Amino acid sequence: MKTWLKTVFGVTTLAALALVVICIVLRPSRVYKPEGNTKRALTLKDILNGTFSYKTYFPNWISEQEYLHQSEDDNIVFYNIETRESYIILSNSTMKSVNATDYGLSPDRQFVYLESDYSKLWRYSYTATYYIYDLQNGEFVRGYELPRPIQYLCWSPVGSKLAYVYQNNIYLKQRPGDPPFQITYTGRENRIFNGIPDWVYEEEMLATKYALWWSPDGKFLAYVEFNDSDIPIIAYSYYGDGQYPRTINIPYPKAGAKNPVVRVFIVDTTYPHHVGPMEVPVPEMIASSDYYFSWLTWVSSERVCLQWLKRVQNVSVLSICDFREDWHAWECPKNQEHVEESRTGWAGGFFVSTPAFSQDATSYYKIFSDKDGYKHIHYIKDTVENAIQITSGKWEAIYIFRVTQDSLFYSSNEFEGYPGRRNIYRISIGNSPPSKKCVTCHLRKERCQYYTASFSYKAKYYALVCYGPGLPISTLHDGRTDQEIQVLEENKELENSLRNIQLPKVEIKKLKDGGLTFWYKMILPPQFDRSKKYPLLIQVYGGPCSQSVKSVFAVNWITYLASKEGIVIALVDGRGTAFQGDKFLHAVYRKLGVYEVEDQLTAVRKFIEMGFIDEERIAIWGWSYGGYVSSLALASGTGLFKCGIAVAPVSSWEYYASIYSERFMGLPTKDDNLEHYKNSTVMARAEYFRNVDYLLIHGTADDNVHFQNSAQIAKALVNAQVDFQAMWYSDQNHGISSGRSQNHLYTHMTHFLKQCFSLSD
């Protein structure tokens, strides 16, 4: 770990420093004025109002050639690609009658659920009121109406059977008008969750609001029970408008704390009252110590695949289970367990990848690290040891979209060697050897270098959504020939709006330092002149498995800072970031807060060498993990930064969630990694903030990175008698996302930076 040296000033040095400070204060403000252009610069108001936001188009597939889409006037429209038929399946007046903001069509197309009264809970979860509309009769279903608010609701894959979660218990309806059947009875607020994840699983493992899955034929329903009874509670005040604040309590396991106890059950929904839920056994090698459930995939109507992780998270076990009619139980034989282990870090990327099963319901494709440490697609038929590697190279496969009888569609960053690009590829798996084709590499090449896709069930048709670097565009394609059929959304209105705007120039390049290569994105002011000197703002996230340097379009706060204020912005992907191989990724394993910071400092020095950066006007800012890195960079004692901002920063990994902290740091125990947990805190660097201007920001109702983190930083700075600025946002969560708070936040940060850089208002 880097040694943090304390600088001692003598009397002469102090006098010289005082003189420098006086000179800086007296220096006149600077105004950035792009010349020779009649276009206007972006304004902060443009950003806060979302004036230049873009649209995407994702079809809601209901068959191989049919999909639904919600129009701009909120009609739900049916489309048939082959017949070119389109019509309104549900009118906006019906939507408005219950103030619906979302919908879901039953697979038999007889009913639609309408979602209203959306109330956000955590990152993915929310509650809502649901109404069922009968399309054939043109009226809402009356009798045995759904309770409110519901935590999650979904249709079965066939017919119009539905399951929902209410007050942490799961209920089943065979038809929308039927009385509900209660499947679970153990649900209790903040203690036992059925069919929905608790806080830590939602945020750090599943990344969903649900934890239940229908079998393909709708016969079985699998669900997870999370028991949080023994988990410590995080409590914080929500001030509201009342005389007394109320207390929010969340079971929240921090590093080293007791974790949720998870059990997976499957219930036969055809006769749920005859045979209750059946528990699926945990693999022995996992059950012998603390473990996590990581995902569930239905393979066929009577075969299911479960994934488990050891608490240390370097060993993952994939277990394939079959329904035994004679036992009326689920059997998970040991010879159907596949183990994935990392010897250099943690298993998988941010999450362990999920399998994409073949038509035979036995073999599957999965992304994991090859012998060279790059994540690639492998074909597993019997054991992981005998896996056949499908892709290879010093790049990474990102995601498998679809596996059909003769094709596999996936995304990667292979093309032209840019880690921050995404293209869609097709592998013809019926051929020997398999042949590979890049579907998107040469489509609108200048405009589109970062794609995702949405496929119909058997990939007969698919939509491509390009996110940049030019204006986003969504297109429909034939899955057999890859030919473009139709442009779904091309953002023409946005294109016209931007014609009179001075946008900055964006460059994505790489810099080398010793044997390391760092990719960076630099946003340069309009009419950029290399012979001049510009202030520099580093925007950092830097967390493990993250990526900031991406070829995507954006008009946001940093775009404004470059366009209007003449600030050069740089984003750098240092060690620990994703999609450049395990050696680069796992460099930060068990030592967070070291290389992420060092690599930002290295990049700043390289940028100064380019000749157009004003060394006296360099700042850094970040949010969440980025707030942690920006804080440590400011306290590095290098003198590179004049000022910086940390929004909702982690300040100690002992304060953060067990699943996340332990994945990258191990356990905070003496016989594991307690020493680095203690050494890597922001508080340990409090003395080194003396010579920088530091703005610390946090929401008081942050359920993710608790306000405790910033409170401890502030306490350490006060104890060290270090001056700093702070801003808190009452009742705001991790995103500080309410309109007025967000406006205040970005206005305040802008004023801080302009003062730091001596820029005129």
From Swiss-Prot:
<keyword id="KW-0965">Cell junction</keyword>
<dbReference type="GO" id="GO:0043542">
    <property type="term" value="P:endothelial cell migration"/>
</dbReference>
<dbReference type="GO" id="GO:0002020">
    <property type="term" value="F:protease binding"/>
</dbReference>
<feature type="binding site">
    <location>
        <position position="204"/>
    </location>
    <ligand>
        <name>substrate</name>
    </ligand>
</feature>
<feature type="disulfide bond">
    <location>
        <begin position="643"/>
        <end position="756"/>
    </location>
</feature>
<feature type="glycosylation site" description="N-linked (GlcNAc...) asparagine">
    <location>
        <position position="99"/>
    </location>
</feature>
<dbReference type="GO" id="GO:0060244">
    <property type="term" value="P:negative regulation of cell proliferation involved in contact inhibition"/>
</dbReference>
<dbReference type="GO" id="GO:1903054">
    <property type="term" value="P:negative regulation of extracellular matrix organization"/>
</dbReference>
<dbReference type="GO" id="GO:0031258">
    <property type="term" value="C:lamellipodium membrane"/>
</dbReference>
<keyword id="KW-0645">Protease</keyword>
<dbReference type="GO" id="GO:1900119">
    <property type="term" value="P:positive regulation of execution phase of apoptosis"/>
</dbReference>
<feature type="active site" description="Charge relay system">
    <location>
        <position position="624"/>
    </location>
</feature>
<dbReference type="GO" id="GO:0045177">
    <property type="term" value="C:apical part of cell"/>
</dbReference>
<dbReference type="GO" id="GO:0005886">
    <property type="term" value="C:plasma membrane"/>
</dbReference>
<dbReference type="Pfam" id="PF00930">
    <property type="entry name" value="DPPIV_N"/>
</dbReference>
<dbReference type="GO" id="GO:0097325">
    <property type="term" value="P:melanocyte proliferation"/>
</dbReference>
<dbReference type="GO" id="GO:0001525">
    <property type="term" value="P:angiogenesis"/>
</dbReference>
<dbReference type="GO" id="GO:0008239">
    <property type="term" value="F:dipeptidyl-peptidase activity"/>
</dbReference>
<dbReference type="InterPro" id="IPR002471">
    <property type="entry name" value="Pept_S9_AS"/>
</dbReference>
<feature type="topological domain" description="Extracellular">
    <location>
        <begin position="26"/>
        <end position="761"/>
    </location>
</feature>
<keyword id="KW-0966">Cell projection</keyword>
<feature type="site" description="Cleavage">
    <location>
        <begin position="23"/>
        <end position="24"/>
    </location>
</feature>
<protein>
    <recommendedName>
        <fullName>Prolyl endopeptidase FAP</fullName>
        <ecNumber>3.4.21.26</ecNumber>
        <ecNumber>3.4.14.5</ecNumber>
        <ecNumber>3.4.21.-</ecNumber>
    </recommendedName>
</protein>
<keyword id="KW-0053">Apoptosis</keyword>
<dbReference type="GO" id="GO:0010716">
    <property type="term" value="P:negative regulation of extracellular matrix disassembly"/>
</dbReference>
<dbReference type="Pfam" id="PF00326">
    <property type="entry name" value="Peptidase_S9"/>
</dbReference>
<feature type="glycosylation site" description="N-linked (GlcNAc...) asparagine">
    <location>
        <position position="227"/>
    </location>
</feature>
<feature type="glycosylation site" description="N-linked (GlcNAc...) asparagine">
    <location>
        <position position="49"/>
    </location>
</feature>
<dbReference type="InterPro" id="IPR001375">
    <property type="entry name" value="Peptidase_S9_cat"/>
</dbReference>
<keyword id="KW-1133">Transmembrane helix</keyword>
<comment type="similarity">
    <text>Belongs to the peptidase S9B family.</text>
</comment>
<dbReference type="GO" id="GO:0005615">
    <property type="term" value="C:extracellular space"/>
</dbReference>
<dbReference type="InterPro" id="IPR029058">
    <property type="entry name" value="AB_hydrolase_fold"/>
</dbReference>
<keyword id="KW-0378">Hydrolase</keyword>
<dbReference type="GO" id="GO:0051603">
    <property type="term" value="P:proteolysis involved in protein catabolic process"/>
</dbReference>
<dbReference type="GO" id="GO:0010710">
    <property type="term" value="P:regulation of collagen catabolic process"/>
</dbReference>
<feature type="disulfide bond">
    <location>
        <begin position="448"/>
        <end position="466"/>
    </location>
</feature>
<dbReference type="GO" id="GO:0004252">
    <property type="term" value="F:serine-type endopeptidase activity"/>
</dbReference>
<dbReference type="GO" id="GO:0045178">
    <property type="term" value="C:basal part of cell"/>
</dbReference>
<feature type="disulfide bond">
    <location>
        <begin position="321"/>
        <end position="332"/>
    </location>
</feature>
<keyword id="KW-1015">Disulfide bond</keyword>
<feature type="disulfide bond">
    <location>
        <begin position="438"/>
        <end position="441"/>
    </location>
</feature>
